[in-house]
């Protein structure tokens, strides 16, 4: 993301640490992978540029359990409604129109936070246009999911877990990068409102690991 364009680096790192402490409180791992100058140097020998950062591997399965505990804790203090679509937001009155299986209902809120994700991007874009809020498009990357035998990435997975590597193509100067690495994970198809995409999952449970890694 581009959060550091709006906040100082130190503030962003502080928020990341706060978020991590919350996740750990609800069962997330405390293990951190440290940067490796050795692997960075190996990449540079082939004109590959690897980002350096502390990383954690939560795991799809382990993260699901962490989220369940977090939601149960939140439910003791706030109301959580699922299976409900927000179909309208009045900017002046702060009244939301929510559609459920029983029909539409109005909900008034002091403050409203839009967190629409990919599935709600069209709704949010239309709402911004209706309320004369200017929009601009971010860069869109064209991606493929690559799967290789896990032994190819074994050194990286054991030392830093997730390599984030960039390469500038010689022909056209395009930036090619890898991200969302899954050590001995699974490649899956996801359907978001009829749009099919390919994603990867990695698990902490050894029994669910495969012989391949993907990114």
Residue ranges, per PLM feature:
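Active-site-adjacent segment of FAD-dependent monooxygenases/related oxidoreductases
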Residues: 24-31
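Residues forming the flavin
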Residues: 1-11, 31-215
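Acidic/polar low-complexity interaction segments
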Residues: 13-16
């Amino acid at each position: 993301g581009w959060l550091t364009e709006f906040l100082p680096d130190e503030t962003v790192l502080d928020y990341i640490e706060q978020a991590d402490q919350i996740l750990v409180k609800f069962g997330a791992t405390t293990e951190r992978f440290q940067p490796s100058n050795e692997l960075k140097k190996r990449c540079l020998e082939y004109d590959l540029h690897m980002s350096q950062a502390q990383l954690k591997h939560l795991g799809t399965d382990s993260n699901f359990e962490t989220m369940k505990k977090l939601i149960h804790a939140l439910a003791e203090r706030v109301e959580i409604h699922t299976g409900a679509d927000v179909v309208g937001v009045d900017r002046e009155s702060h009244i939301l129109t929510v559609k459920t299986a029983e029909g539409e209902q109005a909900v008034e809120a002091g403050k409203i936070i839009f967190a629409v994700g990919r599935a709600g991007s069209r709704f949010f874009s239309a709402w911004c246009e209706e309320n004369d809020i200017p929009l601009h498009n971010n860069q869109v990357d064209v991606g493929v999911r690559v799967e290789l035998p896990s032994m190819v990435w074994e050194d990286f997975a054991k030392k830093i877990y997730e390599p984030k590597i960039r390469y500038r193509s010689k022909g056209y100067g395009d930036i090619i990068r890898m991200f969302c690495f899954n050590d001995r994970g699974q490649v899956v198809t996801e359907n978001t409102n009829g749009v099919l995409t390919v994603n990867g999952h990695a698990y902490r449970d050894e029994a669910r690991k495969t012989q391949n890694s993907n990114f």
